[in-house]
Amino acid sequence: MSQKILFIDRDGTLIEEPKSDFQIDTLEKLRFEKDAIPTLLKLKKFGFKFVMVSNQDGLGTPSFPKENFEIAHEKMLDILKSCGIEFQDIFICPHFENENCACRKPKTAMLEEYIKHELYDKEQSFVIGDRESDMILASNLGVRGLKYGALSWKEIENEILSSFRSASYQRTTKETDIKVKVCLNGGKVSIKTGIDFFDHMLEQIAVHGDIGLEISCKGDLEIDEHHSVEDVALALGACIKKALGDKIGIARYGFTLPMDECLASCAMDFCNRPHLVYKAKFKKSHLGALSTEMIEHFFYSLSYAMGVSLHLKVKGKNDHHKAEGLFKAFAKALKMAVKIESENLASSKGVI
């Protein structure tokens, strides 16, 4: 089974590399790079596995005795383990560059099993290192390389997470042309459906759900808003479902939210058994150019496209507040449900 793997360089990336001799052969030389450990802990929560790939020039020769190397190396691994970080595999090439061995980075001989058995997901795996050889290794593996030094560990974290749990989706019919982009870890918000009040409601999902959301819709508004609202819901739901991927680690569930004099509640379950229970009454037929009856239809279409069981209800006096409360409650429930809480799937069945 393909895994999300970070192939990580050691010296100069994970731990500081002494400029004097480029060898970490004493405990005094062992220092971690800033934010390396917290970043790896964060990425571990998102299901990434770690593989160390390091060139250690002349390891085992008189100039770099193996026992000296192992003292610092084992201490490093002990510290990482105490923090909750372990490497699935550790590959070390001990040769000098002029020996022209098959295993030295950027060659891939050390990773032959990973390549042969397709053990890493090329779309969701990365090489992290401080040298150009690491970037060439990334190219040889068919994954993206992130160069430490040009990027800090926090910037590397952001780069990885912005490409992870993200999706794009396009839905084109005779009635509408819709493009949606979702990043569940946050990002840009841009919504243009041609229905101002609907845009305002969709913005609540992005802002209060803390997600990046871009939606553009060209629809047959000269007829009415029905097709645009329905198809935006279908495209948005499909895009969120795509961004969630295998759903491993998500909380799965969530929320109740007061909105001025209103009380809106939303309960959500990413169970892949779509269902909607909706309890809301509006005095007005329209809010702006959006028919209030289309609010229920939006959530119905959205729940089926997302594959969620969705319970929504609101009570209050002001129709605008009630509508906004529903969208905000949905957003908060979504934020709670997609949050990574563990490394496991939240189901006793082993599948959602």
Curated annotation (Swiss-Prot):
Record organism: Campylobacter jejuni subsp. doylei (strain ATCC BAA-1458 / RM4099 / 269.97)
PANTHER family xrefs: IMIDAZOLEGLYCEROL-PHOSPHATE DEHYDRATASE, IMIDAZOLEGLYCEROL-PHOSPHATE DEHYDRATASE HIS7
Subcellular localization(s) per the UniProt record: Cytoplasm
Active site: D9 (nucleophile), D11 (proton donor)
EC number(s) on file: 3.1.3.15, 4.2.1.19
Name used for this protein in its record: Histidine biosynthesis bifunctional protein HisB
Family as reported in the entry's similarity comment: In the N-terminal section; belongs to the histidinol-phosphatase family. In the C-terminal section; belongs to the imidazoleglycerol-phosphate dehydratase family.
PROSITE patterns: IGP_DEHYDRATASE_1, IGP_DEHYDRATASE_2
CDD domains cross-referenced by the UniProt entry: HAD_HisB-N, IGPD
Residues annotated for Mg(2+) binding in this entry: D9, D11, D130
GO cellular component: cytoplasm
Pfam families linked: IGPD, PNK3P
InterPro entries assigned: HAD-like_sf, HAD-SF_hydro_IIIA, HAD_sf, His_synth_bifunc_HisB, HisB_N, Histidinol-phos, IGPD_sf, ImidazoleglycerolP_deHydtase
Cofactor list: Mg(2+); Zn(2+)
Involved pathway(s): Amino-acid biosynthesis; L-histidine biosynthesis; L-histidine from 5-phospho-alpha-D-ribose 1-diphosphate: step 6/9; Amino-acid biosynthesis; L-histidine biosynthesis; L-histidine from 5-phospho-alpha-D-ribose 1-diphosphate: step 8/9
Name of the coding gene: hisB
GO BP terms: L-histidine biosynthetic process
Chain spans, region Histidinol-phosphatase: 1-164
Residues holding Zn(2+): C93, H95, C101, C103
Reactions catalysed, as given in the entry: D-erythro-1-(imidazol-4-yl)glycerol 3-phosphate = 3-(imidazol-4-yl)-2-oxopropyl phosphate + H2O; L-histidinol phosphate + H2O = L-histidinol + phosphate
